[in-house]
């Protein structure tokens, strides 16, 4: 599923919750570079490098709601690594706490044909979701509020091919998955009590979606009325 590119290429850039540092996830050389944000000089200063396992393919970093933990998704090793984060000292400190698989038990030993692809933190800060291409699934993890550690609750199919990204709705009850190879977006309701997802509607056609985001609509927003066939011909 994933073709390895050994050249440096940053896949995700995200500031730490305290806005002191910028984390650049380099999928090509298996590193997460940490830069200090020098606001006075308007520069970035490299202060640390998280050297990940060789050919693990770090792809995305997300931070817990309280800012104490970092979650890094690894595309090639199909896992999420949990790190503690402390930015109170002179330099940032990251400590590896846990590694969990993104794969179902059926494919747990078949990492070569799968690729972890999307990672999203639920608005309630209590759950983490990820997608895995190849087996085409979404997994949900419960976050321990005290330790930041993850407990997998389910890994289920998403009725699409190559789920490259996902987003959780603000109501915390629904997710949408962008399926790159099947040209669709699929939406689901999350049943936290029974640890399942239920598809809301038929897949929505979108050409080769790569990323999916959700933005609040302003109250004064006015939807543009689609042109009729006759009006379209006149344009």
Language model regions located:
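Beta-propeller fold detector
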Residues: 1-2, 45-50, 92-103, 150-157, ...
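Beta-rich, blade/repeat-based domains predominating
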Residues: 3-19, 52-69, 102-125, 159-174, ...
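Conserved beta-strand positions in repeat-built beta-propeller and related beta-rich domains
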Residues: 16, 24-27, 64, 72-76, ...
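Structural signal for beta-propeller blades
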Residues: 30-32, 78-80, 136-138, 183-185
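Short loop/turn segments immediately following beta-strands, especially the blade-tip
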Residues: 35-43, 83-94, 141-148, 189-196
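Acidic, glycine-rich loop-and-beta core segments that form the ion-binding/anion-interacting portion
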Residues: 49-105
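C-terminal hydrophobic structural anchor segments
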Residues: 139-189
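Blade-level signature of beta-propeller repeat domains, shared across WD40, Kelch, NHL, RCC1
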Residues: 180-189, 198-234
């Amino acid at each position: 599923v994933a073709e390895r590119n050994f050249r440096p290429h940053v896949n995700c850039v995200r500031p730490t919750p305290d806005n002191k540092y910028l984390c650049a996830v380099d999928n090509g050389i298996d590193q997460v570079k940490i830069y200090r944000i020098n606001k006075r000089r308007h520069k970035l200063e490299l202060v640390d490098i998280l050297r990940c396992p060789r050919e693990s393919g770090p792809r995305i970093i997300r931070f817990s709601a309280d800012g104490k933990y970092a979650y890094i998704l690894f595309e090639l090793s199909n896992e999420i690594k949990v790190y503690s984060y402390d930015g109170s000292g002179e330099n940032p400190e990251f400590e590896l706490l846990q590694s969990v698989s993104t794969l179902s038990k059926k494919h747990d030993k078949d990492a070569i044909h799968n690729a972890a692809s999307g990672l999203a933190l639920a608005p309630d800060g209590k759950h983490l979701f990820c997608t895995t291409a190849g087996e085409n699934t979404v997994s949900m993890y419960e976050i321990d509020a005290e330790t930041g550690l993850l407990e997998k609750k389910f890994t289920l199919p998403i009725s699409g091919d190559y789920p490259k990204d996902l987003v959780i709705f603000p109501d915390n009850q629904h997710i949408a998955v962008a399926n790159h190879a099947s040209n669709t977006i699929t939406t689901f309701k999350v049943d936290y009590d029974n640890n399942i997802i239920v598809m809301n509607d038929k897949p929505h056609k979108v050409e080769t979606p790569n990323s999916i985001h959700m933005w609040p609509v302003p109250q004064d927003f006015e939807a543009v009325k689609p042109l009729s066939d006759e009006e379209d011909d006149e344009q």
